[in-house]
């Protein structure tokens, strides 16, 4: 499990409740990790965290990443995430920075946002990593735990973007949703799925060079923005680990 280090400071000034560049950069980072970490079968991201599921029992010849050396797995994965995220964040910021910087005029908000993006790129982000082992039967419960946290984070983020800290004091998620709907006309359920409960990176089979002599089947990592509620569809996770 990887977490952005001091992301409260790093993300200060980004768009609220959800910044498209930040969300896309986290997904790109997750995809890079899934593609480059041995034994990875699933990635899940929400907020500033990424959870990776690694297995070492796919076949008799399968070996564990770094022989399950926890210290090395943690340090290398954190370094990989830091590298991938900073690269992705800069790439994902380029178009909007180019548009704002090349425009003959821009709004105060656009100018402010460009400054925030440039600060983020200059400062860079860092990640921490924790590695732990769970029985394969418990993997889905770990993902359920993270997804439920994602839902809480999402509701609270929308609440914080629309109400003061005093207004939200001691308010639970159901109450915040009611406040948003009644007082602001915002239905939290209308937000895209990946902003409400996170997104996954999964491997799918695709045809390449279709219709030619070189046609073949390949595996490809893709982002799934329409993941199910894991308590209602445990098979989404279990089919990848119960092998």
Predicted regions, residues:
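Regulatory and interdomain segments flanking nucleotide-handling catalytic cores
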Residues: 1-243
């Amino acid at each position: 499990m990887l977490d952005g280090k001091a992301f409260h400071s790093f993300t200060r000034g980004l768009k609220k409740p959800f910044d498209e560049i930040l969300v896309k950069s986290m997904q790109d980072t997750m995809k890079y990790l899934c593609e480059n970490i041995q034994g990875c079968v699933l990635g899940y991201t929400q907020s500033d965290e990424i959870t990776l599921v690694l297995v070492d029992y796919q076949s008799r010849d399968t070996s564990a990443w770094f022989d399950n050396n926890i210290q090395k797995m943690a340090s290398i994965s954190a370094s990989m995430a830091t590298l991938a995220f900073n690269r992705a964040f800069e790439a994902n910021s380029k178009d909007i920075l180019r548009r704002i910087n090349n425009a003959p005029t821009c709004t105060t908000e656009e100018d402010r946002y460009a400054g925030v993006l440039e600060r983020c790129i200059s400062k860079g982000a860092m990640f921490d990593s924790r590695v732990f082992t769970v029985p394969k039967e418990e993997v889905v419960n770990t993902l359920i735990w993270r997804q439920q946290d994602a839902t809480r984070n999402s509701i609270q983020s929308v609440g914080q973007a629309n109400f003061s800290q005093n207004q939200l004091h001691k308010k639970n998620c159901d109450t915040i949703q009611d406040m948003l709907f009644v007082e602001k006309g915002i239905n939290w359920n209308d937000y895209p799925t990946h902003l409400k409960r996170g997104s996954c990176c999964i491997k799918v089979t695709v045809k390449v060079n279709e219709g030619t002599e070189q046609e073949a089947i390949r595996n490809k990592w893709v982002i799934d923005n329409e993941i199910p509620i894991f308590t209602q569809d445990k098979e989404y996770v279990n089919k990848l680990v119960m092998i």
